[in-house]
Amino acid sequence: MAFEKIKVANPIVEMDGDEMTRVIWKSIKDKLITPFVELDIKYFDLGLPHRDATDDKVTIESAEATKKYNVAIKCATITPDEGRVTEFGLKQMWRSPNGTIRNILNGTVFREPIICKNVPKLVPGWTKPICIGRHAFGDQYRATDAVIKGPGKLTMTFEGKDGKTETEVFTFTGEGGVAMAMYNTDESIRAFADASMNTAYEKKWPLYLSTKNTILKKYDGRFKDIFQEVYEASWKSKYDAAGIWYEHRLIDDMVAYALKSEGGYVWACKNYDGDVQSDFLAQGFGSLGLMTSVLVCPDGKTIEAEAAHGTVTRHFRVHQKGGETSTNSIASIFAWTRGLAHRAKLDDNAKLLDFTEKLEAACVGTVESGKMTKDLALIIHGSKLSRDTYLNTEEFIDAVAAELKERLNA
């Protein structure tokens, strides 16, 4: 029986990327998406050569289009360093596309593991996923820091419309040292709170916010207070009805709890904590190649889904020479499924939602049936790894496509 393509009423934004992930991106689209779904795709090429050719305007345009259409699906991209500037002959060292997009969308990045029963976890107690929400604005990432030479007094000045307030920070008496001033805004913290509450409510999981408000009484205290305000005003009754809860915890207490918990909650982290803890979680669950990443905007309606890993340069160099690669495409496939699932929810498209669930199940089912890429086979087999224990890049995508067709025809 021929599969009837699923019609999608509204467009999605596609952001193409670089290197090996660009190669698998095309394969995923050709083998797992377009044969089954009739999509209006607003395409933006965020590959480094095209970003350079457009003076990075394409990145800004893609983010603006995301605001308009509410759903973006993004391939991994290169953030250039000096070496890349030389390699590509770039006009300048362009900023991280992810950073640019996050600043325009003012979103919170949620990362969550994809669990396959046969891939061993470093933390075996984690039987359910832990979704980590990273506030992707301000703090250390927008800070001003300085090296202090010699003795002197460090002060902090704020000039408001009612005049100037000066706060004494420290008096250096010796050789000097270092200093830093950082900030956040009530608007951004409120948006972070709303995105976190919304994500936990959608998943019907409890929500925890971690801070160090015992030390940073005013700074972290503001996060704690705003989260509590947002919860009481907009979410408490919904959470009570769903049998879930919101709680603030100290970061050290939360890290200890995370390690001994079974999972099954959303963890809202400040910017730096989220940067660190999301990698700790990815490794604990088994692999960065099994991690989804979704940027959720404060309107609760706009998202950008992507893989949580880079462009897999090492594999791309082999691919360029015509060699065989075994690159894990699962996180990139899940970028498509999470984006399309959100489109399905916005459009009330049950068929599309069912398709995304079956494609995710086909990915996990393929791995659990023993068909996987080399990185996962290495976690399972270790030193006993041999060529017959894994598939190459295209073979794996073909295996997922076969599994998907079976599930769609069942």
Swiss-Prot record:
NADP recorded as keyword: yes
EC numbers on record: 1.1.1.42
GO terms, molecular function: copper ion binding; isocitrate dehydrogenase (NADP+) activity; magnesium ion binding; NAD binding
Localisation per UniProt entry: Cytoplasm, Cytosol
Traits of the deletion mutant: Slight reduction in plant growth. Constitutive expression of pathogenesis-related genes and enhanced resistance to the bacterial pathogen P.syringae pv. tomato.
Cofactor descriptive note: Binds 1 Mg(2+) or Mn(2+) ion per subunit.
Protein name (database record): Cytosolic isocitrate dehydrogenase [NADP]
Naturally occurring in which organism (per UniProt): Arabidopsis thaliana (Mouse-ear cress)
Lineage: Eukaryota, Viridiplantae, Streptophyta, Embryophyta, Tracheophyta
